């Protein structure tokens, strides 16, 4: 049996789509030295190549892909979006605005200088900033514009070409910039990280290991009673001195949970809960009492839960204010905008932060009720909320403003982004509403992006040869300028106008570029996870601003041309 592959693919849009995705994802796994191409650029390159062979895809698939991606970006940004405006939030907002604004101005200027159309200009901006939200925002606005001006169809095709030509330039230049720019300024990054750590009392260890607490039981001997010297448990401060706390006491055969007034007596059997290294450092007075195996003493269900910060008595407060150890709980991680933060008593909590806490199930539940709620451990998505807010986003996108003879529509990208932010924010405040498992959210977001990339590549591939020869060199130079110059501008603005600590500043700059690989390099250079504070500060707001920038550059383009 003879199978004509070309006819088979052209006659089956779904098959063509998944062939493009599979080949593109394979290509995206290739590495050029330390640089991995990535899924987005892999799918785009394959779709451009197949597009040259006149393979096409239904445009509705492209539209659905970008809609899912943008909506998920909003959902992820929602929990921490509004907290950006507190504490250092003003600085982070201004840095993100400077980064996105300067990049957009440079792209517009270079586009006019070289005589490009808006498709190449917006694509170059998206690729240089390694930002798919820019590409998606520009693509959505262009589609609405093309409906009124079919002559712009070529600009739509050029959008993916500009992105493909400049993406690697943007990624490689930023990674090299992250490695070498900190060395060109006069302040040492590790010193800056230690300085902010001293000012805020933060732990600078970027390689902190996390263990689950364990429980062991001991019989109280004379040495331990002598060490206690008649003090009750509150006066002794067992946790401060040992890193463990006493969960239970058996005295005269009676098992009880002790309060702070309890005094240790010879013959008591106590269960101690703490991290393994805390047990190993116990004062000899504890270990000299015989370790015992008592099923009831050791029968404690230690759980690890993710607690979402919500309540006013925790938001804006330092970790020390929670006094987790006084409640017999252990903090393993602090996560903000999917970024792991430094763990220290002086870290200030934002609404939507996630605390990973271990301890007795009853104690963890009690702590969760005081500071927020335990994140749902479910694989079931609240599809009703997902669909309802998706519809709301599409309805918002239909809103149009009329100014004299000029009309401006919000568009699907901005509408879905706003609806996603609302859903994410409400989810962070209401534990049973709008739950989407992180794995499901990541899958929908990634799949939507890949479908969008496949669509724009197949649509543009037919005209790539004619455009590539004319603008290839200009694109590479422009991509380098738009990638690095805004980083330098942000550094000057942050260092000399905002006077930010350099470790926080470089982390914030990488967050404004939403580039995790560059952030890893900054943390390695600083030998600290302090820069993650800055990265988390700008990351959420930058994703939103970059999407809006993609739409805005298309809207203002006619005015730039004069």
Curated annotation (Swiss-Prot):
PROSITE patterns: RCK_C (PS51202). It comes from the Bacteria. It is found in: Cell membrane. Keywords: Cell membrane, Membrane, Repeat, Transmembrane, Transmembrane helix, Transport. Disulfide bonds: none annotated. GO terms for molecular function: monoatomic cation transmembrane transporter activity. The chain crosses the membrane at residues 8-28, 32-52, 66-86, 94-114, 118-138, 158-178, 383-403, 406-426, 447-467, 475-495, 541-561. Residues 202-288, 290-373 form the RCK C-terminal domain. It is a multi-pass membrane protein. GO terms for biological process: potassium ion transport. One of its GO terms (cellular component) is plasma membrane. Belongs to the AAE transporter (TC 2.A.81) family. YbjL subfamily. PANTHER family: K(+)_H(+) ANTIPORTER SUBUNIT KHTT, TRANSPORT PROTEIN YBJL-RELATED. This is Putative transport protein YE1478. It comes from Yersinia enterocolitica serotype O:8 / biotype 1B (strain NCTC 13174 / 8081).
């Amino acid at each position: 049996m003879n199978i004509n592959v070309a006819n088979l693919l052209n006659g089956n849009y779904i098959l063509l789509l998944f062939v493009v995705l599979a080949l593109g994802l394979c290509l995206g796994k290739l590495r050029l030295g330390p640089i991995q191409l990535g899924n987005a650029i892999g799918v785009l390159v394959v779709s451009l190549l197949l597009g040259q062979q006149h393979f096409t895809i239904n445009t509705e698939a492209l539209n659905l892909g970008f809609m899912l991606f943008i909506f998920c970006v909003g959902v992820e940004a929602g929990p921490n979006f509004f907290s950006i405006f507190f504490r250092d939030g003003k600085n982070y907002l201004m840095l993100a605005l400077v980064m996105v604004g300067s990049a957009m101005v440079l792209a517009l200027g270079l586009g006019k200088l070289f005589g490009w159309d808006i498709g190449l200009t917006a694509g170059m901006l998206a690729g240089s900033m390694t930002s798919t939200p820019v590409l998606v925002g520009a693509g959505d606005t262009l589609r609405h514009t093309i409906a009124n001006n079919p002559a712009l169809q070529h600009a739509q095709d050029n959008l993916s070409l500009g992105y493909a030509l400049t993406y690697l330039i943007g990624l490689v230049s930023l990674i090299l910039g992250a490695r070498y720019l900190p060395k060109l300024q006069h302040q040492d990054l590790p010193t800056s990280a230690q300085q902010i750590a001293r000012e805020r009392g933060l732990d600078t260890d970027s390689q902190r290991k996390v263990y689950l607490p364990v429980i062991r039981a001991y019989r109280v001997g004379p040495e331990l009673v002598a060490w206690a010297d008649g003090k009750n448990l509150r006066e002794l401060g067992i946790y401060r001195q040992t890193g463990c706390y006493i969960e239970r006491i058996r005295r005269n055969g009676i098992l009880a949970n002790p309060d702070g007034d309890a005094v240790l007596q010879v013959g008591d059997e106590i269960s101690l809960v703490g991290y393994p290294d805390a047990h190993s450092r116990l004062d000899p007075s504890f270990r000299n009492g015989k370790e015992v195996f008592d099923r009831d003493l050791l029968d404690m269900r230690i759980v690890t839960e993710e607690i979402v910060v919500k309540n006013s008595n925790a938001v804006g407060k330092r970790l020390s204010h929670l006094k987790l150890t006084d409640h017999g709980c252990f903090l393993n991680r602090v996560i903000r905008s999917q970024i792991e933060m430094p763990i220290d008593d002086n870290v200030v909590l934002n609404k939507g932060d996630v605390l990973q806490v271990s301890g007795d199930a009853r104690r963890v539940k009690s702590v969760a009720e005081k500071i927020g709620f335990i994140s749902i451990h479910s694989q079931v998505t609240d599809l009703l909320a997902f669909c309802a807010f998706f519809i709301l986003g599409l309805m918002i996108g239909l809103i149009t403003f009329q100014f004299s003879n000029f009309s401006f529509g919000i568009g699907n990208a901005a509408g879905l982004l706003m609806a996603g932010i609302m859903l994410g924010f409400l989810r962070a405040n209401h534990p049973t509403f709008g739950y989407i498992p992180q794995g499901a959210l990541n899958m929908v977001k990634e799949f939507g992006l890949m479908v969008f990339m496949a669509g724009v590549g197949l649509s543009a591939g037919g005209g790539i040869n004619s455009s590539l020869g004319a603008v290839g060199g200009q694109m590479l130079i422009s991509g380098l300028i738009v990638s690095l110059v805004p980083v330098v501008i942000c550094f000057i603005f942050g260092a000399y106008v905002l006077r930010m600590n350099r470790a926080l500043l470089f982390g914030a700059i990488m967050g404004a570029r939403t580039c995790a690989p560059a952030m890893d390099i900054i943390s390695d250079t600083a030998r600290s996870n302090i820069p993650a504070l800055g990265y988390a500060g700008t990351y959420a707001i930058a994703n939103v601003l970059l999407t809006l920038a993609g739409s805005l550059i298309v809207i203002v383009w006619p005015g730039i041309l004069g």
